[in-house]
Amino acid sequence: MSVQGFWGLQLVPGKTYSQVVSAPFRITMASLAADAEAGKRTSVSVLVDEKEFVLCTLVPNKIEQQPLDITFVEGEEVTFSAKGQNNIHLTGNYVFQDDEDDEMGASMIDSDEEDNVEDFLKKLPPNASKEDINKALLGLEVDEEIESDEEVESDEEIESDEEIESEEEEEEPVPVSKKRPAEEVKEIASKKQKAEKKEQPKKEKSKKEEPKKEEPKKEQPKKEEPKKKEEPKKKEEPKKKEEPKKKEEPKKKEEPKKKEEPKKKEEPKKKITKLPNGLIIEDIKMGEGASCKNGQRVGMRYIGKLTNGKVFDKNVSGKPFSFLLGRGEVIKGWDLGIAGMKAGGERKLTIPAPLAYGKRGAPPDIPKNATLVFDVKLLSMK
């Protein structure tokens, strides 16, 4: 069962409308605008993966509406356009899975995963280090998945596909649940205290860097003032009346420049997007290059917190956390919130419980119905 919300777009001939899909939606109807000119033929096209396709062609008084059934998923780059003389209205709906279906599937996966993790830990040598355990849990299945993908060209294609699907189901509760074997619960608590101590000097450094940018700006007018005072000493008395005019002009010009520059820099940092499913995406830094898509392997740094500020998980050094985007290897809030990021980009994701760990939570660190806050940074994508 799915939850549906209205989606709509008005196409104007000569203009294109591009986006990276952040929430799946379905187009169900294309219609001519009410003020369409008679006899003017208009076509609707969509560009996907650098290939253009015509969805329909509408003609006033002949074909004014055309039912459609086209769905676009998260991470796809799509561009809509209209060619002709008339405006076109595209309508449809967003599509999200119901919470109850997600929780039933998640509970079955969680129980199976816990059994598999316990069996796997029993097979490890008693002197295995924490780093060996993490690599075994996070890296082993990923390496096997890549190798199986490269070999799927023979008669065993069906069998290898089934193995990949089972591995993805076991990895679904990443990034938190995979790092919680029973032997590491005590170590996580000590890491949380270190994370809180590390965050304080980082905040102090950012505060110190801000006034450093303002100091050279204030020193500029100070250098100009003594020069202006020396000039009237050499000049005659009637020219002293012109001094206040010369002082006022540069001050008026410099003040708006100082105010405009920080405003332009702050605008992209505070870009906030709220999706109909409750996910809030705040772009802190945009990054450079192409946007990441579904199916790409991305490397991430992150800090996971509860709404009260308590840190429950993080990856801030060492090997970045990597996963296949849009393949269900992480919580839904990550698949939706990271899509469209660029290398070096930073975001703050506020993820509601239905897109995280739902009513069950992930004891003991994540309570039931918990809203999670992640500070994420995209390091790489392949």
UniProtKB/Swiss-Prot annotation:
Gene that specifies this protein: FKBP4
Region ranges (Disordered): 139-274
Catalytic activity, reaction form: [protein]-peptidylproline (omega=180) = [protein]-peptidylproline (omega=0)
Stated family: Belongs to the FKBP-type PPIase family. FKBP3/4 subfamily.
Any single Pfam family the record assigns to this protein: NPL
Domain PPIase FKBP-type: 295-382
Keywords, ordered alphabetically: Chaperone, Isomerase, Nucleus, Rotamase
Acidic residues composition bias: residue spans: 141-173
Function: PPIase that acts as a histone chaperone. Histone proline isomerase that increases the rate of cis-trans isomerization at prolines on the histone H3 N-terminal tail. Proline isomerization influences H3 methylation thereby regulating gene expression.
Superkingdom of this protein's organism: Eukaryota
Top EC class for this record: isomerase
Cellular localisation: Nucleus
Alphabetized GO MF terms: peptidyl-prolyl cis-trans isomerase activity
High-level lineage: Eukaryota, Fungi, Fungi incertae sedis, Mucoromycota, Mucoromycotina
Protein name: FK506-binding protein 4
Main location: nucleus
UniProt note on regulation of activity: Inhibited by both FK506 and rapamycin.
Quaternary structure annotation from Swiss-Prot or TrEMBL: Binds to histones H3 and H4.
Ranges annotated as biased composition (Basic and acidic residues): 180-190, 196-270
This protein's GO CC annotations: chromatin; nucleolus
